[in-house]
């Protein structure tokens, strides 16, 4: 079942490409026709590729992966931040920092610095800092928040990357290709489809088009998160966590006690069943109150009647 309809794509203007003077010949296979000097994108192909990208994102997140949302152009900044925050995924909607992926160790140090500054009370001058020092720290925090705030919870390189306007975000795509990170992206008629593993032909300039496609990717991530949390319940086992030594000893003692318990119960059950069998055999061999047959009962009744007739009647 398609996650979006062609009518929705048409209403959001996903089918509008760039003018004929600004196009990449490699995108020719995704172009349906040309109207008034503007290329029209084939939405049938877009629909199929959206479903493919949706399934990939869902499976990636379901298996514990993360999707980095990237879109620094004005048309994409708001929807990138909104949808990424909705599903708890990292995002970059300001300037892309060179080396964010290829030099992630250094970036991670700056993220730790940002978390340290978040704990500072800039209005409290009794902690040993002067007002000037607090002002400098506040400016540093604001600068880090603007550039790294969207990836503050990113502990390792992402599993995949969603990109709006692959031509503008060429630095991010180059770093992802060096690290072998799959890229899902909107391909307008001026983009290179060879740079993206999961292309979605569409309009990357219209706000409604960008918002719709970004929401679809976020919905796929949300569905993957639901599957991830349902897996331990379905399989009946939660992911193992490291135990302390004393916890491990208690667990081993409990396992040993459980291993001995069924043996004792089996012995008791065997003894009880043996007694019941012996008792039933004795009752069958020598019944205490065996029921009388119908013939014996009739003979007894006739004898009592005869005796009563022979007995003398008292005057």
From Swiss-Prot:
The keyword Lyase does not apply. Residues 272-282, 297-315 have a biased composition (Basic and acidic residues). Pfam families: Ribosomal_S2. GO terms for biological process: translation. GO terms for cellular component: cytosolic small ribosomal subunit. InterPro entries: Ribosomal_uS2 (IPR001865), Ribosomal_uS2_bac/mit/plastid (IPR005706), Ribosomal_uS2_CS (IPR018130), Ribosomal_uS2_flav_dom_sf (IPR023591). Keywords: Ribonucleoprotein, Ribosomal protein. It comes from the Bacteria. Residues 250-315 are annotated as: Disordered. GO terms for molecular function: structural constituent of ribosome. HAMAP family: Ribosomal_uS2_B (MF_00291_B). NCBIfam families: rpsB_bact. Belongs to the universal ribosomal protein uS2 family. This is Small ribosomal subunit protein uS2.
């Amino acid at each position: 079942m398609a996650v979006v309809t062609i009518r929705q794509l048409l209403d959001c203007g996903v089918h509008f490409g760039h003018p004929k003077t600004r196009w990449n010949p490699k995108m020719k296979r995704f172009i349906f026709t040309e109207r008034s000097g503007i290329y029209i994108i084939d939405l049938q192909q877009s629909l199929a590729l959206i479903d493919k990208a949706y399934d990939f994102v869902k499976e990636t997140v379901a298996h514990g992966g993360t999707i980095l949302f990237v879109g620094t152009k004005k048309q994409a900044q708001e929807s990138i931040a909104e949808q990424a925050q909705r599903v708890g995924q990292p995002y970059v909607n300001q300037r892309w920092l060179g080396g964010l992926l290829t030099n992630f160790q250094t970036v991670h140090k700056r993220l730790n610095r940002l978390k340290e500054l978040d704990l500072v009370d800039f209005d409290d001058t009794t902690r040993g800092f002067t007002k000037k020092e607090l002002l400098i720290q506040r400016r540093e925090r604001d600068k880090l928040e603007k550039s790294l705030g969207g990836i503050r919870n990113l502990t390792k390189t992402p599993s995949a990357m969603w990109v709006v306007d692959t031509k503008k975000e060429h630095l991010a795509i180059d770093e992802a290709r060096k690290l072998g990170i799959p890229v899902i992206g909107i391909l307008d008629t001026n983009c290179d489809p060879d740079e993206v593993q999961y292309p979605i032909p569409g309009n990357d300039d219209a706000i409604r088009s960008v918002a719709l496609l970004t929401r679809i990717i976020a919905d796929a991530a949300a569905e993957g998160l639901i599957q991830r949390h349902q897996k331990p319940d379905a399989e009946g086992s939660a992911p193992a966590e490291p135990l302390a030594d004393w916890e491990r000893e208690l667990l081993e003692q409990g396992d040993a006690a459980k291993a001995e318990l069924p043996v004792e119960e089996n012995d008791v059950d065997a003894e009880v069943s043996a007694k019941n069998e012996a008792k039933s055999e004795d009752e069958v061999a020598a019944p205490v109150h065996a029921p009388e047959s119908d013939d014996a009962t009739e003979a007894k009744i006739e004898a009592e009647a005869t005796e009563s007739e022979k007995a003398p009647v008292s005057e």
